[in-house]
Design a protein with these regions (language model features):
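Aromatic-anchored segments of alpha-helical transmembrane domains
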Residues: 65-72, 132-141
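Central hydrophobic cores of alpha-helical transmembrane segments in multi-pass inner-membrane proteins
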Residues: 20-39, 101-116
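Membrane-interface helix-loop-helix modules in multi-pass inner-membrane proteins
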Residues: 36, 65-111
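Membrane-interfacial, low-structure loops and terminal tails that flank and connect transmembrane helices
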Residues: 37-56
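Cytoplasmic-side transmembrane-helix entry/capping segments in multi-pass membrane proteins
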Residues: 54-63, 121-133
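Short, strongly hydrophobic alpha-helical membrane anchors
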Residues: 1-13, 82-85, 89, 145
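Transmembrane helix-loop junctions at the membrane interface of multipass transporters and ion channels
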Residues: 140-156
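Alpha-helical transmembrane segments of polytopic membrane proteins
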Residues: 10-24, 57-59, 94-108, 156-158
Length: 158
Protein backbone atom coordinates (compact mmCIF):
# COMPACT_ATOMS: atom_id res chain seq x y z
CA UNK A 1 0.00 0.00 0.00
CA UNK A 2 1.24 3.48 -0.86
CA UNK A 3 2.05 5.56 2.23
CA UNK A 4 1.01 9.22 1.72
CA UNK A 5 3.52 10.37 4.35
CA UNK A 6 6.62 8.16 4.10
CA UNK A 7 9.38 8.62 6.63
CA UNK A 8 11.97 8.57 3.86
CA UNK A 9 11.90 9.79 0.29
CA UNK A 10 14.67 9.75 -2.30
CA UNK A 11 15.14 13.50 -1.83
CA UNK A 12 15.51 13.19 1.94
CA UNK A 13 17.99 10.33 1.62
CA UNK A 14 20.04 12.24 -0.94
CA UNK A 15 19.97 15.43 1.17
CA UNK A 16 21.14 13.53 4.23
CA UNK A 17 23.98 12.18 2.09
CA UNK A 18 25.21 15.76 1.71
CA UNK A 19 24.95 16.28 5.47
CA UNK A 20 27.06 13.19 6.16
CA UNK A 21 29.54 14.18 3.41
CA UNK A 22 29.93 17.57 5.10
CA UNK A 23 30.42 15.82 8.44
CA UNK A 24 33.09 13.64 6.79
CA UNK A 25 34.97 16.72 5.57
CA UNK A 26 34.74 18.37 8.99
CA UNK A 27 36.01 15.29 10.83
CA UNK A 28 38.74 14.58 8.27
CA UNK A 29 39.98 18.12 8.93
CA UNK A 30 39.75 17.47 12.69
CA UNK A 31 41.78 14.27 12.29
CA UNK A 32 44.50 16.14 10.35
CA UNK A 33 44.46 18.89 12.98
CA UNK A 34 44.80 16.34 15.78
CA UNK A 35 47.67 14.65 13.95
CA UNK A 36 49.53 17.93 13.43
CA UNK A 37 49.08 18.91 17.07
CA UNK A 38 50.43 15.52 18.13
CA UNK A 39 47.70 14.63 20.62
CA UNK A 40 47.88 11.12 22.09
CA UNK A 41 45.93 9.07 24.59
CA UNK A 42 46.79 5.90 26.46
CA UNK A 43 44.78 2.75 25.87
CA UNK A 44 43.57 0.81 28.92
CA UNK A 45 45.85 -1.96 30.17
CA UNK A 46 43.39 -4.57 28.87
CA UNK A 47 43.97 -3.25 25.33
CA UNK A 48 47.75 -3.05 25.57
CA UNK A 49 48.25 0.20 27.47
CA UNK A 50 50.12 1.93 24.66
CA UNK A 51 49.98 5.53 23.44
CA UNK A 52 47.78 6.05 20.40
CA UNK A 53 47.59 9.21 18.28
CA UNK A 54 44.16 10.77 18.80
CA UNK A 55 43.99 11.34 15.04
CA UNK A 56 43.41 7.58 14.58
CA UNK A 57 39.90 7.33 16.06
CA UNK A 58 38.92 10.63 14.42
CA UNK A 59 40.10 9.33 11.05
CA UNK A 60 38.13 6.09 11.53
CA UNK A 61 35.03 8.09 12.48
CA UNK A 62 35.51 10.30 9.40
CA UNK A 63 35.76 7.22 7.15
CA UNK A 64 32.59 5.82 8.75
CA UNK A 65 30.81 9.09 7.94
CA UNK A 66 32.09 8.87 4.36
CA UNK A 67 30.68 5.35 4.04
CA UNK A 68 27.34 6.51 5.45
CA UNK A 69 27.30 9.42 2.98
CA UNK A 70 28.07 7.06 0.09
CA UNK A 71 25.29 4.72 1.24
CA UNK A 72 22.89 7.66 1.09
CA UNK A 73 24.02 8.65 -2.39
CA UNK A 74 23.81 5.19 -3.95
CA UNK A 75 20.76 3.80 -2.12
CA UNK A 76 18.13 6.45 -2.79
CA UNK A 77 16.29 4.23 -5.30
CA UNK A 78 14.07 2.37 -2.79
CA UNK A 79 13.44 4.62 0.22
CA UNK A 80 11.23 2.05 1.96
CA UNK A 81 14.14 -0.43 2.06
CA UNK A 82 16.76 2.07 3.26
CA UNK A 83 18.23 0.89 6.58
CA UNK A 84 19.85 4.03 8.02
CA UNK A 85 16.97 5.62 9.88
CA UNK A 86 15.85 6.51 13.39
CA UNK A 87 15.31 3.19 15.22
CA UNK A 88 11.79 2.63 16.53
CA UNK A 89 13.00 1.88 20.07
CA UNK A 90 14.84 5.23 20.20
CA UNK A 91 11.80 7.04 18.88
CA UNK A 92 9.67 5.41 21.59
CA UNK A 93 12.23 6.38 24.26
CA UNK A 94 12.21 10.01 23.10
CA UNK A 95 8.40 10.01 23.10
CA UNK A 96 8.40 8.86 26.74
CA UNK A 97 10.47 11.91 27.73
CA UNK A 98 8.57 14.31 25.46
CA UNK A 99 5.58 14.81 27.75
CA UNK A 100 5.51 18.32 29.30
CA UNK A 101 6.54 17.38 32.85
CA UNK A 102 9.45 15.14 31.83
CA UNK A 103 10.55 17.61 29.14
CA UNK A 104 10.62 20.51 31.63
CA UNK A 105 12.46 18.49 34.28
CA UNK A 106 15.02 17.11 31.82
CA UNK A 107 15.56 20.56 30.26
CA UNK A 108 16.15 22.07 33.69
CA UNK A 109 18.62 19.34 34.68
CA UNK A 110 20.49 19.70 31.38
CA UNK A 111 20.61 23.49 31.76
CA UNK A 112 22.07 23.21 35.26
CA UNK A 113 24.56 20.59 34.01
CA UNK A 114 25.62 22.88 31.16
CA UNK A 115 26.24 25.75 33.59
CA UNK A 116 28.02 23.51 36.08
CA UNK A 117 30.24 21.89 33.41
CA UNK A 118 30.78 25.06 31.33
CA UNK A 119 34.57 24.96 31.64
CA UNK A 120 34.64 21.39 30.35
CA UNK A 121 32.18 21.99 27.47
CA UNK A 122 34.30 24.76 25.94
CA UNK A 123 37.38 22.59 25.55
CA UNK A 124 37.88 22.00 21.82
CA UNK A 125 37.51 18.22 21.82
CA UNK A 126 34.48 18.20 24.13
CA UNK A 127 32.77 20.87 22.03
CA UNK A 128 33.63 18.97 18.84
CA UNK A 129 32.16 15.73 20.21
CA UNK A 130 29.01 17.60 21.28
CA UNK A 131 28.69 19.13 17.79
CA UNK A 132 29.06 15.70 16.18
CA UNK A 133 26.49 14.11 18.49
CA UNK A 134 24.06 16.94 17.74
CA UNK A 135 24.47 16.78 13.96
CA UNK A 136 24.28 12.97 13.73
CA UNK A 137 21.22 13.00 16.01
CA UNK A 138 19.61 15.61 13.78
CA UNK A 139 20.41 13.52 10.71
CA UNK A 140 18.71 10.50 12.26
CA UNK A 141 15.73 12.56 13.45
CA UNK A 142 15.18 13.98 9.95
CA UNK A 143 14.34 10.43 8.82
CA UNK A 144 11.06 10.72 10.78
CA UNK A 145 8.24 12.32 8.75
CA UNK A 146 6.57 14.02 11.73
CA UNK A 147 9.83 15.57 12.97
CA UNK A 148 10.61 16.81 9.46
CA UNK A 149 7.20 18.48 9.25
CA UNK A 150 7.66 20.22 12.60
CA UNK A 151 11.15 21.61 11.98
CA UNK A 152 10.30 22.54 8.38
CA UNK A 153 7.33 24.76 9.28
CA UNK A 154 7.83 28.40 8.22
CA UNK A 155 7.69 29.63 11.82
CA UNK A 156 10.65 27.37 12.71
CA UNK A 157 12.88 28.30 9.77
CA UNK A 158 14.76 31.63 9.89
Amino acid sequence: MLDPHPDLTSGVIHGLGYLYALLFCMNAYWAVRSFKLGYHFRLPKSLGGQDVPSAGPWAMYAVLLLLVALAHFVSAGRPDAFLIRLPGWLQDLVNVFADPISYFALSTVLFVAMIWLREWWVKPTAAWVLLNITLVSMGLAITDYDFRQIVGKPDNVP
